[in-house]
Amino acid sequence: MAKTVAYFYDPDVGNFHYGAGHPMKPHRLALTHSLVLHYGLYKKMIVFKPYQASQHDMCRFHSEDYIDFLQRVSPTNMQGFTKSLNAFNVGDDCPVFPGLFEFCSRYTGASLQGATQLNNKICDIAINWAGGLHHAKKFEASGFCYVNDIVIGILELLKYHPRVLYIDIDIHHGDGVQEAFYLTDRVMTVSFHKYGNYFFPGTGDMYEVGAESGRYYCLNVPLRDGIDDQSYKHLFQPVINQVVDFYQPTCIVLQCGADSLGCDRLGCFNLSIRGHGECVEYVKSFNIPLLVLGGGGYTVRNVARCWTYETSLLVEEAISEELPYSEYFEYFAPDFTLHPDVSTRIENQNSRQYLDQIRQTIFENLKMLNHAPSVQIRDVPAGLLTYDRTDEADAEERGPEENYSRPEAPNEFYDGDHDNDKESDVEI
């Protein structure tokens, strides 16, 4: 049976700009939405312009001092915040840019609203490609991330769900989410990422397993350069299958960072768009309520292709290999296809022996789990908002203009293949 899919897109989120030459480009969200729109995928989803998160919402996880700083600081007054900039790790990699707090409010609100709708059974799957900023910590920014929308969304899910499983397929370790839930068995975190050679953020060893009540509820899959579709699948599917079997989550949050694709400007993996999408499709196959988020991804045209393809998988709608014409069509030159060859010459350093060793260690750790930890019954806290689906127009009756307002960001357009030539060592 087809799932009900809610899709969250803020038409202004693509306007924000981290600064000249910065690898993180919110404009990729406008490209993604444009493809979703022109493929007609919006007809298969309930489309929402999302809620904007308040300071109070953000302080569910972050410190009040940090969030107050994010709201107050701007490029024009930042000289007066020198001490705070250092204290909160805001600077080169996490710059102060115009509308910083508003940007955080928009992507965080969408994840929070997605979680609320899953709680209220308005949808089976909620999609927020603007979210997934997994490095942000309680007291500081990190790796292009300011507010950890994932943690805030999971905290909302925990009002209704006894056990939430978090899966991260970004090339970078999901350190902010792991740190937030390191001591609890209510959330199990599973991260597949590049590890070693001082690769950011430097955490995510296989032996980081959680502590106290959360011991063995943190699972890391450290990978080496050049992993391809076959090797990734050899680990991903059996590991996730075992985790779901042992943990029995009642909800899943999936972070779909697209920097694990081949040809990503800041990545070193060799996944194809189909291989990346196969992970999403596999997680969907468990038929467990699912919050799908974005994350990293720095070759803009491939990020848009990847997340559009994964949207099509989530709504179970086949789409053509030829990209539909749109205002961003020239971004996808010279092939104008959905699945270009993104393989690189990076050698796959993940031998079958190495992958089998990881899998064996992970399975041994899973045996240490108590099956499906129980939660004491108590009153459910008030939800974020109350939704009435009758307020939504039928997808077939909505025109594209009701679902999409094109952002205009003249300073955000694609600068060519060398606009950020791997000089930064901090990424999502």
Swiss-Prot record:
In this chain, 1D-myo-inositol 1,4,5,6-tetrakisphosphate is annotated as bound at 17, 21, 25, 265
Its protein name is Histone deacetylase 3
Q: What gene name is listed for this protein?
A: HDAC3
User: Where does the record place the region Disordered?
Assistant: 388-428
Q: What post-translational events are described?
A: Deubiquitinated on 'Lys-63'-linked ubiquitin chains by USP38; leading to a decreased level of histone acetylation.
Residues recorded as bearing Phosphoserine in the entry: 424
Q: Which species is this UniProt entry from?
A: Pongo abelii
Self-association state and partner proteins as the record states: Interacts with HDAC7 and HDAC9. Interacts with HDAC10, DAXX and DACH1. Found in a complex with NCOR1 and NCOR2. Component of the N-Cor repressor complex, at least composed of NCOR1, NCOR2, HDAC3, TBL1X, TBL1R, CORO2A and GPS2. Interacts with BCOR, MJD2A/JHDM3A, NRIP1, PRDM6 and SRY. Interacts with BTBD14B. Interacts with GLIS2. Interacts (via the DNA-binding domain) with NR2C1; the interaction recruits phosphorylated NR2C1 to PML bodies for sumoylation. Component of the Notch corepressor complex. Interacts with CBFA2T3 and NKAP.
- Basic and acidic residues: bias regions: 388-405, 415-428
